[in-house]
Amino acid sequence: MWPPTSITPFNPFQIPLLNTIILISSGVSVTWAHHAIMENNNSQMTQGLFITIILGIYFTILQAYEYFEAPFTIADSIYGSTFFMATGFHGLHVIIGTLFLLICLIRHLNNHFSSNHHFGFEAAAWYWHFVDVVWLFLYISIYWWGN
């Protein structure tokens, strides 16, 4: 039986769905920033990157809120262990990706990137997309199927 009968899982259509929308939106905004830098549109690059960073921070805050409000702990069952380890490991990668993108924003504001020279940002954007895709699998397997 998954989750165990003693566990009350989160409603997948509340904070988990909001977090899914936030990460998908951040994937759109980082893509917007990437297209902007390729077109030498510095103001849109700044806007897209700033929005992505804010969305990453917002996701992290909501995830922390969810942890504090969880009706179960990491020690309650295999479900609690799986939930906190999988979402925590993902959350750590979101924080790392947000820091990567923040460094890219600082570098962009210091004119370290151009339309032909922006691999650091491109690598961070690919990393961010990977984190997005991983979240979709976590959302389906932990929140949706686990409900």
UniProtKB/Swiss-Prot annotation:
- Chief location of this protein within or outside the cell: mitochondrion
Keyword Transmembrane on entry: yes
Q: Which GO terms describe its molecular function?
A: cytochrome-c oxidase activity
Q: Its Gene Ontology biological processes? A: mitochondrial electron transport, cytochrome c to oxygen
The record's SUPFAM superfamilies line, in alphabetical order, gives:
Cytochrome c oxidase subunit III-like (SSF81452)
The compartments listed are: Mitochondrion inner membrane
Entry-linked InterPro entries: Cyt_c/ubiquinol_Oxase_su3, Cyt_c_oxase_su3_dom, Cyt_c_oxidase-like_su3, Cyt_c_oxidase_su3-like_sf, Cyt_c_oxidase_su3_a-hlx
Q: Where do transmembrane segments lie in this chain?
A: 13-33, 48-68, 83-103, 125-145
Under catalytic activity, the entry for this protein gives: 4 Fe(II)-[cytochrome c] + O2 + 8 H(+)(in) = 4 Fe(III)-[cytochrome c] + 2 H2O + 4 H(+)(out)
Name the GO cellular-component terms.
mitochondrial inner membrane
Protein's membrane topology:
Multi-pass membrane protein
UniProt keywords, alphabetically: Membrane, Mitochondrion, Mitochondrion inner membrane, Translocase, Transmembrane, Transmembrane helix
**Subunit notes for this chain?**
Component of the cytochrome c oxidase (complex IV, CIV), a multisubunit enzyme composed of a catalytic core of 3 subunits and several supernumerary subunits. The complex exists as a monomer or a dimer and forms supercomplexes (SCs) in the inner mitochondrial membrane with ubiquinol-cytochrome c oxidoreductase (cytochrome b-c1 complex, complex III, CIII).
Protein's job = Component of the cytochrome c oxidase, the last enzyme in the mitochondrial electron transport chain which drives oxidative phosphorylation. The respiratory chain contains 3 multisubunit complexes succinate dehydrogenase (complex II, CII), ubiquinol-cytochrome c oxidoreductase (cytochrome b-c1 complex, complex III, CIII) and cytochrome c oxidase (complex IV, CIV), that cooperate to transfer electrons derived from NADH and succinate to molecular oxygen, creating an electrochemical gradient over the inner membrane that drives transmembrane transport and the ATP synthase.
Q: What is this protein called?
A: Cytochrome c oxidase subunit 3
* Native source species: Spodoptera frugiperda
